[in-house]
C-alpha cells in the first residue's frame, strides 16, 4: 500500500488546497485526510511531502503504530521528529550552530536522548524533577517555536508534520496525547509560527480528533477520500496502458470498473495483472476471464487475509455476521443474528474499532475499513 500509481486521478483539488496552505504559511489551517483502505491516502501524503519539500518547507514524516500512540511514547515520538528536523536546515556554519542550539532546546523537553547533528553529538539527561510539572502541550509548543526559529535562519517557509495511520492515537483517561498535539499546534499558530499539521488515517480518526478537542473542526480542512468516479476511474485504468500503446476492450473496462467499484488500489491491481498477463496489444474479454481468478486470489492473500487474521475468534464471527449484510450492518441486525445484547457485543466491537477492522459510519452502524472486505469474507465461506 502507498506505492505511487502511474495515474493519480481525482485528487487534483486536494493537492491544490495543500498548495494554498504552503503559499500562506500563517493561514493557521491544517489537513485531516481520511478514507478506507486502498483509496490512495498514503499516495496523496507522498505528493504533499514532495510539494512541501520542493517549496523549501521542513517536513517530518511518520507512520504511527500502536506503540507510538502509547502515552509513555507519544511525547518522545513527536519531539524526536522535531529534533530530526533541525538536521535538515540548510545554510552555513552560523545556521548549523543555531540548529545545534535548537536541537539542544528541544532535547531538554525529552529528558534523555542523543542524536548526531552535523557531526556533533547532541544529548541531554534528565536534570531535576521540576520538568515533570510541565504539560506536554507546553513542551510541544515550545519545541515547535524553537524549530520554527531555525526556519528563518535557513530560509525555510515553515514546518510540516505529516502523520499517517494516525487513527491509532486517541485520548486515554488520565493521559494527554492527541489533545496535547492539537493544543500545541493551535497555540503555535496563534503566535504566527508557520506550522502545518497533516493527520491521515481511517474514518474513525475524525471521531478521535473531535473527542480530543471541541474546537478541532476549526483547525482542519477535512479531505474525505473515496472511490474514483467517472471519468477518473476509467482513466486510472486506461491512461497508463495507452502511454505504452496498450488498450483495453470496452467490455473489459466496464467489467473491471464494476469489479473494483472505482477503488484506486483495486484498479491498480487489475490493471497490473491484465497488463502482465495479456500478450496482445489489445487486452480482451478472454484475458480478463482467464486472469480474474488469479487477481481475486492475489487480493485475498495480499490485501484482505492479513486484516482478517488480526481478528480473534469472536471478532471474526462478528466480521462474518457483518458480511452477511454486505459491507456494513446495523447493531440491531448484529444483535438479532448473534443472539447477543448490545452490551454483550460492545467489548468485541471496541476491540475491532481499535484494531482498525471496522468503523462507525453512523451511531448504530458498523462498516468494514477495507472496501469489498465483505465480498472477501463471503468468498472464504464458499
Language-model features: where?
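P-loop NTPase nucleotide-binding core
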Residues: 27-39, 43-159, 169-175, 195
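Conserved small helical "lid"/interfacial subdomain of P-loop NTPases
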Residues: 225-252
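Sensor-1/coupling segment of RecA-like P-loop NTPase cores
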Residues: 152-155, 159-162, 167-213
Amino acid at each position: 500500500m502507498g506505492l505511487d500509481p502511474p495515474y493519480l486521478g481525482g485528487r487534483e483539488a486536494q493537492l491544490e488546497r495543500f498548495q494554498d496552505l504552503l503559499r500562506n504559511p500563517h493561514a493557521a489551517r491544517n489537513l485531516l485526510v481520511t478514507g478506507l483502505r486502498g483509496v490512495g491516502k498514503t499516495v496523496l501524503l507522498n505528493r504533499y511531502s514532495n510539494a512541501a519539500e520542493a517549496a523549501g518547507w521542513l517536513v517530518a514524516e511518520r507512520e504511527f503504530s500502536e506503540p507510538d500512540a502509547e502515552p509513555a511514547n507519544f511525547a518522545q515520538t513527536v519531539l524526536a521528529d522535531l529534533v530530526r528536523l533541525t538536521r535538515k536546515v540548510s545554510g552555513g556554519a552560523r545556521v548549523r550552530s543555531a540548529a545545534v542550539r535548537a536541537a539542544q532546546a528541544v532535547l531538554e523537553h525529552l529528558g534523555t536522548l542523543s542524536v548526531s547533528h552535523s557531526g556533533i553529538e547532541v544529548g541531554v539527561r534528565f536534570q531535576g524533577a521540576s520538568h515533570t510539572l510541565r504539560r506536554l502541550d507546553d513542551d510541544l509548543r515550545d519545541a515547535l517555536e524553537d524549530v520554527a526559529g531555525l526556519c528563518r535562519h535557513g530560509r525555510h517557509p515553515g514546518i510540516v508534520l505529516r502523520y499517517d495511520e494516525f487513527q491509532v492515537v486517541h485520548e486515554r483517561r488520565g493521559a494527554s496525547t492527541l489533545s496535547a498535539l492539537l493544543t500545541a499546534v493551535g497555540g503555535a499558530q496563534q503566535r504566527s509560527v508557520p506550522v502545518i499539521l497533516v493527520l491521515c488515517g481511517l474514518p474513525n480518526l475524525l471521531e478521535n480528533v473531535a473527542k480530543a478537542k471541541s474546537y478541532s473542526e476549526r483547525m482542519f480542512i477535512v479531505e474525505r477520500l473515496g472511490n474514483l468516479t467517472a471519468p477518473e476511474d476509467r482513466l486510472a485504468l486506461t491512461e497508463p496502458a495507452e502511454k505504452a500503446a496498450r488498450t483495453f476492450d470496452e467490455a473489459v473496462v466496464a467489467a473491471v470498473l464494476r469489479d473494483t467499484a472505482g477503488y484506486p488500489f483495486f484498479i491498480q491491481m487489475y490493471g497490473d495483472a491484465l497488463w502482465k498477463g495479456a500478450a496482445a496489444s489489445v487486452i480482451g474479454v478472454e484475458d480478463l476471464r482467464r486472469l480474474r481468478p488469479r487477481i481475486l486470489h492475489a487480493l485475498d492473500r495480499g490485501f484482505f487475509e492479513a486484516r482478517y487474521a488480526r481478528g480473534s475468534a469472536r471478532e471474526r464471527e462478528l466480521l462474518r455476521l457483518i458480511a452477511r449484510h454486505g459491507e456494513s450492518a446495523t447493531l440491531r441486525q448484529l444483535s438479532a443474528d448473534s443472539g447477543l445484547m448490545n452490551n454483550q457485543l460492545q467489548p468485541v466491537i471496541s476491540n475491532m474499532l481499535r484494531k482498525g477492522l471496522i468503523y462507525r459510519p453512523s451511531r448504530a452502524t458498523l462498516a468494514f475499513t477495507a472496501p469489498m472486505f465483505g465480498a472477501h469474507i463471503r468468498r472464504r465461506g464458499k
